[in-house]
């Protein structure tokens, strides 16, 4: 059952909250809504489930305007897990979950309702709380109870507003695994406002980036979560890479500050794990960093991938001389303002032949003095200031 949002405008108390929002959620898909605080994510979900009447535009569920449906009819099609997990009355956990069956049942319920409620509680890990007063639970436990209530509602469309906000890491993963399974195995259309960009990228098929009440971008996580889009939507500087364990996009926030290396183009020669601390310091300082040559799968290679740096790699045991990687590295070096070479990396066969002296070069590490191929020798913790200074100083050649 598809959910289609077209030209949605929402004004509250004379303030425009949403402006011309378009989105389409298909069966079997989990769509994440991401954006900064106050962007309009919660308002969008409340308009989707009919709680807020839009100023303009439509929300169609299976072709019917959700705002024209009765409350019971809308609840049979759309279930919602709110951000606020507070419950005002002293119901037991089971009674709260049973409320999800109200759109489907008569006053007395059926054996089917009982089975659906039991399964929902087991699936969300709250069955052990069934007889407890829901107000006695922690915020995270209550959040899981509300998810169980939504599952018991058995609606083909599920909306979740920050479903992991009150949960510890274990239950964040468990909750999103349940939600992912609802889309995959039960073909539900799921929309979730998610604060954590890494979790959103890992579990969602598509992301909708909302900022200032508008959709800034929408699509697959890898196409949407780019440094430029995140900068525009969140006003944040980030590095975007790939998690080696999950293969999902990862977003690493970086300090937005001025440093000696800010906006300087630096090529870092790698090998093993020698370049990793250098790359991390330079990326955090705002430098534009490329890396290579590194060996595929080693620590420097994974670091470059995770922080989103362009990287030239070679297969293990490959001779560097006269390879495509050597040519690519020479091009990166020629385009850089400064080269940073860990002393250990310079010992790799073929690396010294890449250092022509045409670009100012830093040796990074411990040595008795600057090697003949470098303009300066610095410790790793001084590489940022050294890059800034050397970028303004012509190389003497080597």
Swiss-Prot record:
A molecular-function term among this protein's GO annotations: ABC-type vitamin B12 transporter activity
Localization per record: Cell membrane
Cysteine-cysteine disulfides: none
Domain of life according to the entry: Archaea
EC number: 7.6.2.8
Catalytic function, reaction form: an R-cob(III)alamin(out) + ATP + H2O = an R-cob(III)alamin(in) + ADP + phosphate + H(+)
Residues annotated for ATP binding in this entry: 35-42
NCBIfam families: PRK09536.1 (NF007082), PRK13548.1 (NF010068)
Record's function text: Required for corrinoid utilization. Probably part of the ABC transporter complex BtuCDF involved in cobalamin (vitamin B12) import. Probably responsible for energy coupling to the transport system.
Name of the protein this chain belongs to: Cobalamin import ATP-binding protein BtuD
Origin species: Halobacterium salinarum (strain ATCC 700922 / JCM 11081 / NRC-1) (Halobacterium halobium)
Gene: btuD
